[in-house]
């Protein structure tokens, strides 16, 4: 049956729960429909249990592996009323501490009144042999907790608010959640809960809230600022904030202006003139930006007057490394000797790594304890391999963890407990957002040196800000621009094409070479077929490159040539089903032993084990790539090996993982791969840009194969569209900020 655009309702009783994620409520269940049929239902239905009745609203869909399913958008649930239904409900372990045996005793004693006794008169349960008062209270508390969750879901469902929002609300506020959201539905828009303003607004207006209330306008204002922060902006202009909030909420600009004033007074919002713009910040982003600028300015003004003989030291380092430095690299050494903070930017093959190695050797001569760092695990690993020194992610360096309320990140290293080093060399700086740069600077002692290295022409950070570009454009921080392509890289078509594309030139894609090939495929399905062939047979057989050394990149997650569809194809080709190979389904994804997977959110608490079983540390970070080594249905765990260290995930944690044979260009930043297959086709206009193509090409070390339409490639080269990022760091460094 084809999906219908009109919502469909199915009424029935839960026959079995196949899968349930306790964190996000995603559920797969069998529903005995009232018409006598049985169907598989998927969706966010927290705490679903066999025996309960529900009305699910949604549409039919066909899963490529599991066939026809009903995708539920909402579920209206009713508590069982008859003794038989109550027994089925409790025997299905709906309430922690109650199984089939206890359920039978309860229903035999209290019949259809069992649930009322559980919730309101738990002391009566002690009349049953084996149930103590403490056990009765525990069972009652568990039932009330679930009942409270159900009431919250039902209350929010009145405004068609997603069940996952109810789940987050209850996890965060507990038994107070329903009362809090009834008092102020706009609490749902907070970062911790993550509802859209439209969801909270529908609930509030539906329950009699004034459409011009101060709470409503404040929520809309903060939502607009948070929405823009997700899109990379540190601030937006006052005028744009008034217009956007007015459009979102439907209230006059004057009321929004009053709300801004109130939020400024409360400290939740900061209004300041930035480079001639009347800007409005979320307080946390303003603090991060202001501190970063203040600290960098202080460091930039610190010059070392007692200069060593850099010419002599450079010659000594050249002999040590077996290299001859170009003049630009000697300049990096001179600046690193003279200044507390410097920036180095350059494209592929221009000697950034050589400059890092040279400065590292220089700091050794100066007897400075130097720490190497990068934004991602893959970038840190590459930095270690190229320098022969240990490098860490910024998060691991700063000993990241969760805050006391478990809703935000916290760093153990800060002003009160700074890093015990004399210098930090930070690579891949274009990936660092304003909050992370602020955290690093807070953790550095006042005298600690900082070397910032990166390629300012690559994509900016995913998080707010344009830190590396702002630092370089300010002209305040001593900067070296590496432009000379060295002999080893000069013969590479990958390097030549990258620089040509960065200049806006159209290379001859038909002119294939030893390390670059273009395969023209204008049909998306044929392009996808070609990608699979390259990874499965052509590169392993013809060029002796194993699939483990091949990374497929694409600008987008969607469409036939996007990340999601290609990962399904490559899993089937490179790691198919086999006897003895265990699997675990999670939503629409099947995880299988042997799969290549990526961590997609920071997990600061997960434990890493060495092969001998000893603890290697804690924390797996967004972008880390590993391989599934074991799936254990008995313990409901899945193990992933990351560079020889194994992390074990409970099945409820699998929303932290996704397949990684294919990744988006954005996710590939900071990494380098022996062979890259870049598939370009249909994508959103802001993904088909020169910076995306340039970033993708510069990920390839030895071989680059582009599959797709040359028209799309040339369009990307010509498309310099960059969504302007409202970031005030450059203006602060240049002294262009003041009161609004």
Can you say where each PLM-predicted feature lies in the sequence?
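Conserved helicase motor core of P-loop NTPases
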Residues: 456-618, 629
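Pre-Walker A segment
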Residues: 273-348, 354, 360
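Conserved helicase motor core of SF1/SF2 NTP-dependent helicases
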Residues: 358, 362-368, 374-386, 395-403, ...
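Accessory, non-ATPase domains that flank or precede helicase/AAA+ motor cores in DNA-metabolism machines
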Residues: 1-308
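Loop/turn positions that initiate beta-strands
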Residues: 51-53, 594, 623
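C-terminal accessory regions
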Residues: 503, 611-614, 622-740
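Short hydrophobic/aromatic beta-strand immediately N-terminal to the Walker A/P-loop
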Residues: 342-345, 451, 551-553
């Amino acid at each position: 049956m084809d999906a219908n655009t009109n919502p469909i309702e199915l009424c029935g009783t839960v026959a079995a729960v196949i899968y349930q994620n306790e964190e996000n409520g995603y559920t797969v269940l069998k529903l005995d429909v009232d018409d006598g049929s049985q169907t598989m239902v998927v969706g966010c239905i927290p705490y679903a249990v066999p025996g309960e009745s529900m009305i699910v609203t949604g549409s039919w869909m066909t899963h490529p592996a599991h066939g026809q399913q009903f995708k539920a958008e909402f579920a209206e649930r009713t508590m069982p009323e008859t003794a038989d239904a109550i027994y089925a409900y409790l025997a299905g372990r709906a309430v922690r501490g109650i199984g089939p045996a206890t359920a039978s005793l309860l229903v035999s004693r209290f019949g259809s009144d069992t649930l009322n006794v559980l919730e309101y008169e738990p002391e009566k349960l002690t009349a049953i042999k084996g149930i103590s008062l403490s056990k009765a209270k525990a069972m009652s508390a568990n039932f009330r907790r679930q009942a409270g969750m159900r009431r919250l879901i039902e209350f929010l469902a009145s405004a068609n608010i997603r069940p996952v929002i109810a789940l987050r609300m209850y996890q965060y506020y507990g038994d107070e959640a329903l009362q809090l959201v009834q008092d102020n539905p706009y609490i749902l828009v907070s970062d911790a809960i993550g509802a859209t303003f439209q969801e909270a607004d529908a609930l509030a207006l539906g329950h009699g809230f004034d459409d011009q209330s101060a709470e409503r306008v404040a929520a809309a204002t903060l939502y607009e600022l948070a929405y823009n922060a997700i899109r990379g902006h540190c601030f937006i202009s006052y005028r744009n904030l008034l217009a956007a909030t007015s459009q979102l909420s439907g209230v006059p600009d004057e009321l929004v202006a009053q709300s801004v004033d109130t939020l400024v007074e409360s400290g939740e919002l900061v209004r300041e003139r930035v480079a001639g713009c009347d800007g409005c910040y979320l307080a946390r982003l303003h603090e991060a930006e202001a501190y970063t600028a203040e600290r960098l300015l202080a460091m930039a003004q610190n010059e070392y007057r007692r200069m060593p003989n850099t010419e002599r030291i450079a010659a000594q380092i050249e002999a040590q490394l077996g290299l001859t430095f170009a003049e630009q690299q000697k300049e990096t050494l001179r600046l690193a000797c003279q200044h507390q903070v410097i920036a180095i930017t350059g494209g592929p093959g221009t000697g950034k790594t050589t400059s890092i190695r040279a400065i590292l050797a220089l700091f050794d001569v100066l007897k400075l304890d130097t720490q190497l760092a990068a934004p991602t695990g893959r970038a840190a690993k590459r930095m270690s391999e190229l320098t022969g020194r240990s490098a860490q992610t910024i998060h691991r360096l700063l000993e990241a963890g969760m805050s006391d309320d478990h809703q935000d990140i916290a760093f153990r290293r800060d002003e009160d407990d700074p890093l015990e080093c004399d210098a930090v060399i930070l690579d891949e700086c274009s990936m660092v957002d304003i909050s992370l740069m602020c955290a690093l600077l807070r953790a550095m002692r006042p005298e600690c040196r900082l070397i910032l290295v990166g390629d300012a022409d690559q994509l900016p950070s995913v998080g707010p800000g344009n830190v590396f570009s702002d630092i370089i454009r300010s002209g305040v921080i001593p900067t070296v621009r590496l432009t000379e392509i060295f002999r080893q890289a000069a013969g590479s078509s990958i390097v030549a094409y990258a620089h040509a594309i960065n200049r806006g030139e159209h290379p001859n894609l038909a002119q294939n070479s030893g390390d670059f090939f273009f395969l023209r495929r204008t049909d998306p399905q044929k392009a996808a077929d070609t990608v699979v062939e390259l990874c499965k047979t052509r590169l392993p057989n013809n060029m002796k490159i194993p699939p483990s050394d091949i990374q497929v990149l694409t600008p987008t997650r969607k469409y036939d040539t996007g990340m999601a569809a290609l990962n399904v194809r490559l899993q089937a080709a490179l790691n198919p089903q086999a006897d003895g190979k265990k699997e675990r389904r999670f939503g629409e994804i099947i995880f299988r032993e042997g799969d290549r997977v990526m961590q997609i959110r920071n997990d600061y608490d997960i434990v890493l084990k060495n092969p001998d079983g000893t603890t290697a540390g804690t924390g797996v970070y967004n972008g880390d790539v590993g391989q599934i080594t074991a799936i254990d249905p008995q313990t409901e765990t899945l193990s992933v090996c990351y560079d020889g260290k194994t992390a074990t995930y409970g099945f409820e944690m699998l929303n932290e993982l996704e397949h990684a044979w294919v990744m988006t260009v954005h996710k590939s930043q900071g990494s380098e791969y022996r062979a890259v297959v870049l598939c370009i086709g249909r994508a959103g206009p802001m993904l088909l840009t020169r910076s995306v193509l340039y970033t993708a090409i510069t990920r390839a070390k030895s071989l680059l194969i582009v599959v797709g339409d040359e028209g799309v490639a040339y369009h990307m080269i010509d498309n310099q569209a960059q969504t302007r990022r409202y970031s005030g760091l450059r203006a602060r460094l240049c002294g262009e900020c003041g009161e609004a």
